Amino acid sequence: MSTLAGKTILMSGGSRGIGLAIALRAAADGANIAMLAKTDSPHPKLEGTVHSAAEQIRAAGGQALPIVGDVRDDDHITEAVMKTQGEFGGIDIVLNNASVIDLSRSLDLSAKKYDLMQDVNVRGTFMLSRAAVPILKDAENPHILSLSPPLNPTPKWLGAHTGYTLAKYGMTMVTLGLAAEFAADGIAANTLWPRTTIATAAVQNLIGGDKVMAASRTADIYADAAYVVLTQPARTYTGQSLIVEDVLEANGVTDFSGYAAVPGTPDSALFPDIFLD
């Protein structure tokens, strides 16, 4: 399979950033995208709502179903799955995009924020994927894709920001577990993570401001890699913790200069993403 035309994606989040970029790449093929997101109205510090994202998806050539809801709420998840199936006739892909980030050290991390990261990142990934599995089983080439890193249990990352590390690794463990559990059903489940930081609001506001943004790549590189993953044969392309650049290289892309957030920035000057040595 080399196209997402007519395929239906149910994603968590997607109002902006990486999730929206992936949605727009799929929309260019004529995919259907349902987004479960909280952003019913504009955020004072963040661009985009689930409704503005839907408008962009339609303009790019896809069909959109904006669903206002919270991935922490089981009823909202059930409703999103039912609405997506009702609107588009099925679900081919689940994209676990919604994620909360807080890089605070353990003594500075509030219990509330720790729980939030666990609830959105780990539990949300599990519950949304699980709710969609009965429908994915009927899809021609079903995929689950989570935007989380490979498991790297080194002190460097476990100790840097334990709460966030556990939440992101939890997403990966859920996804790899689903890959094993539903392999016989032909459902692929993989994770995807970049080698460099991506120019998103999270990087701007929480990681490094303008300096790191200028040393990042655009979300288009993530979107192009996700597209490759989601068009692979599900029965054989599964159970992997994939790296964005490796996926593209395996697909014949060797020049990443066009993805630099600031044109002309050499690869050597880009800021490495966390969790990778």
Task: Identify the meaning behind each predicted range.
Residues 2-88, 101-102:
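Short-chain dehydrogenase/reductase
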Residues 7, 62-63, 90-91, 136-150, ...:
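Active-site loop of short-chain dehydrogenase/reductase
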Residues 26, 90-92, 172-175, 182-194, ...:
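Conserved Rossmann-fold SDR core element
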Residues 80, 95, 128-132, 136, ...:
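Hydrophobic positions on the long internal alpha-helix
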Residues 86, 103, 111, 120-140, ...:
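Amphipathic alpha-helical dimer-interface segment in Rossmann-like NAD(P)H-dependent oxidoreductases
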Residues 100, 107-126, 145, 164, ...:
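Catalytic Tyr-X3-Lys loop
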Residues 137, 143-184, 195-198:
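Catalytic loop of short-chain dehydrogenase/reductase
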Residues 191-192, 210-277:
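C-terminal helical subdomain
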